[in-house]
Each structure stands twice: as C-alpha cells, then as structure tokens.
Regions:
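Catalytic machinery of carbohydrate-active enzymes
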Residues: 1-238
C-alpha cells in the first residue's frame, strides 16, 4: 500500500505539530508514508531519519503564490507528478477543495480530508485529532518527538563543546509569520530567569528574515547575551 499525507502549512513548527498525526497514520496502516510539504517546513533537514516517512515530496508553492505548483497549470503539473507514484490512499490536513480534486485526478483511490470550507477559526491540533478519529478511528495525542541519529547527536556535542556542568537550552526564536513570532523581551526574561538558578548556555535557532534578525540581535545585546550562541547560519541538521 502506498500512502500520501499532504501538510501544506509553511513553518517548521507546523510540521512538528503534525508529526504525531503523520506517524500515527503510518503505524495504523503498517507502512511508511510519503509526505507532500513545502520546502519552508525544512522537513528534509530533520525528518530524514524518521522510519515512518518513506519519501518527502516538495510542494513548490509558497504563501506568495509562486512556484511550479501554483495556479491552474501548476495544479496540472502536481497531478501528473502524484499520478506517477500510484498512491492508494491520501490524507489531506486541510479543508481545501483544490487538493481534494488534485488527489482524485491523480487517481488516488481513497482520499481522506478535513470537512471542506471550514478553515476559519480551525484549531490546528483539535482539527487534526477529530479528523483522524472520525476517518480511521485513531486517537492521537499531540506530543511531537523528533528522532535523530545518535551519531549526529554526538557530533553536535563535540562541535559545540557541550559540558555536563551547564544546562544547554535550545530556543526557537524565529517564526514563519508575524503572528507566530514572540517578542525578544519574552526570551530575554526567560534567559535571565534561568541564569538566576543555574549556569546555562543558550542556542538561538532562527531564520534570516529581517524581523527574525531583529529579535536575535536584541537577545544577543542583552545582559546575558554573552551566554547565547546564534544558529541562524546553519541548517537544522547541522
């Protein structure tokens, strides 16, 4: 059986939120699944070691409607590409009629999807839970875990000189949109609070958008900025 899961939200955090649901589908159907995701989700950088995912297919369509899968002719290209995979089932984690039609025209026999046209005020986690419970009787808890190769973990420890005498904390300070970004002051208060109790070292993970760099620089310029290391120049798997 060949199974496709479509998760078209753009952020890394979005991908992490949906990961337990994708893994639950794989375990329920007893087969690794292929996922159709945007490049901005960075799935290729942190899901390559996931045994529940067999292939990562790029959805080349961003929030500005650019890319080879955008528009009418882009949809035709995507239909052709998906048809070649010969998928038996598809799970669509959104309420878009577009993806339902694409899956049907790609000759996918069984297509499961959120109720159409119900995107407004849709709770990202509850909608996914209700979807899988209703369609395939799955109860899934929202407890994402990212499984990494132990060798990569040991390499990172050596590269960044992790010390057992310090608490190493990774902070995701970026965001894929303005409404998803937390002010620098919130992180600064957290960093100051932690350092009042323990000797900590902070790694600041973010992108390179202007707003994200502004948050990064404010944190680095704070009282405990010297205990922070920026990671915006690295990929997730680095």
């Amino acid at each position: 059986m060949k199974v496709l899961v479509i998760q078209n939200r753009m952020g890394i955090g979005d991908m992490v939120i949906f990961l337990p649901f994708i893994e639950a589908i794989s375990k329920k159907l007893k087969t690794p699944v292929s996922i159709l995701v945007k490049e901005s989700s960075k799935s290729r950088e942190f899901l390559n070691d996931n045994k529940n995912i067999s292939e990562i297919i790029d959805l080349e369509r961003d929030n500005k409607n650019k890319g080879k899968h955008d528009g009418f002719f882009g949809s035709l290209k995507l239909i052709k590409e998906l048809k070649d995979y010969k998928f038996d089932k598809a799970f669509i984690f959104n309420s878009s009629l577009r993806f339902f039609v694409i899956c049907k025209l790609a000759r996918i026999k069984k297509v499961y999807q959120y109720p159409l046209f119900e995107k407004k005020n849709q709770h990202i986690i509850k909608a996914a839970q209700e979807f899988l419970n209703k369609k395939i009787k799955l109860d899934v808890e929202s407890k994402p875990e990212i499984n990494l190769d132990i060798n990569k973990i040991n390499e990172a420890k050596q590269k960044y000189n992790f010390s057992s005498s310090k608490i190493n904390i990774l902070l995701g300070i970026g965001g894929s949109g303005k409404t998803k970004r937390i002010p620098a002051e919130t992180f600064i208060k957290f960093i100051d609070h932690c350092n009042n109790f323990k000797d900590c070292r902070f790694f600041l993970a973010t992108g390179n958008h202007e707003e994200e760099l502004e948050i990064l620089n404010k944190i680095l310029g704070s009282a405990n900025g010297g205990k922070c290391e920026k990671l915006n120049h690295l990929k997730i798997n680095e």
